Swiss-Prot record:
Cross-link (Glycyl lysine isopeptide (Lys-Gly) (interchain with G-Cter in SUMO2)): K11, K288, K302, K403, K421
Annotated region (Disordered), positions in chain: 154-262
Quaternary state and interactors: Can form homodimers or heterodimers with TEL2 or FLI1. Interacts with L3MBTL1 and HDAC9.
Keyword Transcription regulation applies: yes
Gene Ontology CC annotation, any one: nucleus
PNT domain: residues covered: 40-124
Record's protein name: Transcription factor ETV6
UniProt-recorded Gene Ontology molecular function terms: DNA-binding transcription factor activity, RNA polymerase II-specific; sequence-specific DNA binding
Length: 452
């Protein structure tokens, strides 16, 4: 009995399995292409063979996608029938399940489903983070994880050198060759148009690699004439801890760099947090530039300061994968359970964050100074939900305390005041009268503003 072409194809696949070509090869598998792969390693590649609508991140799967993934896994791995009713959830909920949860919902196949999901997550993660940089067919602007915003033309270009073959991918990591052309604010020379086949990748990150120091800029035209040529130096890009990139199905020949011995390594570390760094003249962000010594070891380099105006002209907005910075926000002045102005002033004096607005001159004598009257008025306005509060309006409320001998202005001193009573002594008095006076003062201010 002769075999049909379909049966021959299935038989051939069982004998020798060849992973399908993909524009983004799997990072998890280190087995060379076109080599028979054992059954134990097939799970590393099987997620690529998922149906097209399941090739998204599992967190974006709908409930129907989860059910179809269970059905696909049951057929692909010859598992026992899986009750899809025990997995009535979307992809986000599926990722919350532990291995024990999978075993509880599917006693016979739960461990396989859990491991398969972990392999899918492992393969999808580097595909999003690194594919725009290492595969020329992909566009950076289509990836939501990496945003490179550029408003000015850059003089630094990135050219990819020749890709390694599948045999020497571990020995010779691919490099990115950065070509630096010096800039002069006075003279501009004509630059030849780049080779369209090279397709340089331009980004604001290029300027962070090499930047002329202020001393070098001060040398003027002499430095411009000496450095008016491109200086290539290679950078070895390592997206994984194995320090290599996966091979591509189609090699792209490029002229190799003449300085291969001085390769610099950039370790791309994925981070769960993509925190935006908005670079503007009010913020100074220092990026550490690692340098390689002659023996190949990393040494900490000097920070590259990005607070200069000319640097900011080339780097406006960069999405950098870093941990969130510590919060140093200016306090807005809202204090709970604080209705009266004297109590509010006492609370501010007890908080060191407000020393730029008000502070003690002599705490024993209860003498305080208003450092920033307009800023203090804004804090009081924020506390009272009065955005148009001014120091003149706030000082009217202070005058009521003069009459009640609670606060006194120091004679001959500007913006220097003294508390005549302690908070306990003030609270034991007629606080209801104080609240009435301050409320009346605010009502009069609102009425006057409405009349205007």
């Amino acid at each position: 009995m002769s075999e049909t072409p379909a049966q021959c194809s299935i038989k051939q696949e069982r004998i020798s399995y060849t992973p399908p070509e993909s524009p983004v090869p799997s990072y998890a598998s280190s087995t060379p292409l076109h080599v028979p792969v054992p059954r134990a390693l097939r799970m590393e590649e099987d997620s690529i063979r998922l149906p097209a609508h399941l090739r998204l991140q599992p967190m974006f799967w709908s409930r129907d996608d989860v059910a179809q993934w269970l059905k696909w896994a049951e057929n692909e791995f010859s598992l026992r029938p899986i009750d899809s009713n025990t997995f009535e959830m979307n992809g986000k909920a599926l990722l919350l399940l532990t291995k024990e949860d999978f075993r509880y919902r599917s006693p016979h196949s739960g461990d396989v489903l859990y491991e398969l999901l972990q392999h899918i997550l492992k393969q999808r993660k580097p595909r999003i983070l690194f594919s725009p940089f290492f595969h020329p067919g992909n566009s950076i602007h289509t990836q939501q994880e990496v945003i490179l915003h550029q408003n000015h033309e850059e003089d630094n270009g990135v050219q990819r050198t020749s890709r390694p073959s599948a045999e020497n991918v571990h020995q010779n990591p691919p490099t990115i060759e950065l070509l630096h052309r010096s800039r002069s604010p006075i003279t501009t020379n004509h630059r030849p148009s780049p080779d369209p086949e090279q397709r340089p990748l331009r980004s604001p990150l290029d300027n962070m690699i090499r930047r002329l120091s202020p001393a070098e800029r001060a040398q003027g035209p002499r430095l411009h004439q000496e450095n008016n040529h491109q200086e290539p130096y290679p950078l070895s890009v390592s997206p994984m801890e194995n320090n290599h990139c996966p091979p591509s199905s189609e090699p792209h020949p490029r002229p190799s760099s003449p300085r291969q011995e001085g390769t610099r390594v950039i370790q791309l570390m994925p981070s769960p947090i993509m925190h935006p760094l908005i670079l503007n003249p009010r913020h100074s962000v220092d990026f550490k530039q690692p340098r390689l010594s002659e023996d190949g070891l990393h040494r900490e380099g000097k920070p590259i300061n990005l607070s200069h105006r000319e640097d900011l002209a080339y780097m406006n907005h960069i999405m950098v994968s870093v941990s969130p910075p510590e919060e140093h926000a200016v306090p807005i002045g809202r204090i709970a359970d604080c209705r009266l102005l004297w109590d509010y002033v006492y609370q501010l004096l007890s908080d060191s964050r407000y020393e730029n607005f008000i502070r003690w001159e002599d705490k024993e004598s209860k003498i305080f100074r208003i450092v920033d009257p307009n800023g203090l008025a804004r804090l009081w306005g924020n506390h009272k939900n009065r955005t148009n509060m001014t120091y003149e309006k706030m000082s009217r409320a202070l005058r009521h305390y003069y009459k009640l001998n609670i606060i006194r202005k120091e004679p001959g001193q500007r913006l220097l005041f003294r508390f005549m009573k302690t908070p306990d002594e003030i609270m034991s008095g007629r606080t209801d009268r104080l609240e009435h006076l301050e409320s009346q003062e605010l009502d009069e201010q609102i009425y006057q503003e409405d009349e205007c």
